[in-house]
């Protein structure tokens, strides 16, 4: 039940997605189904690493990730979820390649990377079709919604067949 998330992140309003949201003003209780550890993301304004160059900033955040995995968790972390660009968290854009550097650490530890593309997917970054493409990676799982439905309640999740088939359910739909 251990998850890594990014400080200042927003992942939704359901009980589980509020649990991994990295903003205290969205949390109404501490009784959540996950044990979440928050790591530094692309937010620079009040970050202790904000004064660094892009490469140094990325390296400092990756070092923080390594440290939190080692000392801030029990070690059996399921995944890290991140928005390629934080929307509700202040429209925060990390340096290109940022999540690629983080994914290298996650892969070494056997931790899945989930890209929350609800706000950035379907060409909404203006540069790429998916926000994660700016980081030179393919996430293990990615979620998408707003750009797909154009106002209608549509969403999706994409992962490898191995991951999707590991869920012994008839459906994962919420609609």
Enumerate the predicted regions with their spans.
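Conserved N-terminal phosphate-binding loop of PLP-dependent enzymes in the Aspartate aminotransferase
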Residues: 1-175
């Amino acid at each position: 039940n251990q998850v890594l998330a990014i400080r200042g992140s927003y992942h939704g309003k359901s009980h589980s997605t509020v649990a991994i949201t990295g903003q205290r003003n969205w949390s109404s209780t501490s009784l959540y189904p996950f044990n979440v550890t928050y790591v530094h993301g692309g937010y620079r304004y009040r970050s202790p690493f904000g004064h660094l160059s892009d490469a140094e900033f990325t390296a400092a955040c990756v070092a923080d990730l390594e440290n939190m995995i080692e000392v801030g968790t029990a070690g059996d972390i399921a995944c890290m979820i991140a928005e390629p660009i934080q929307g509700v968290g202040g429209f925060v854009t990390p340096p290109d390649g940022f999540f690629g550097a983080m994914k290298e650490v996650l892969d070494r530890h056997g931790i899945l990377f989930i890209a929350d593309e609800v706000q950035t997917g379907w060409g909404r970054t203006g540069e790429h079709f998916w926000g994660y493409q700016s980081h030179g990676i393919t996430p293990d799982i990615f979620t998408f919604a707003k750009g797909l439905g154009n106002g209608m309640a549509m969403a999706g999740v994409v992962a490898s067949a191995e991951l999707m088939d590991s869920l012994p359910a008839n459906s994962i739909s919420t609609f």
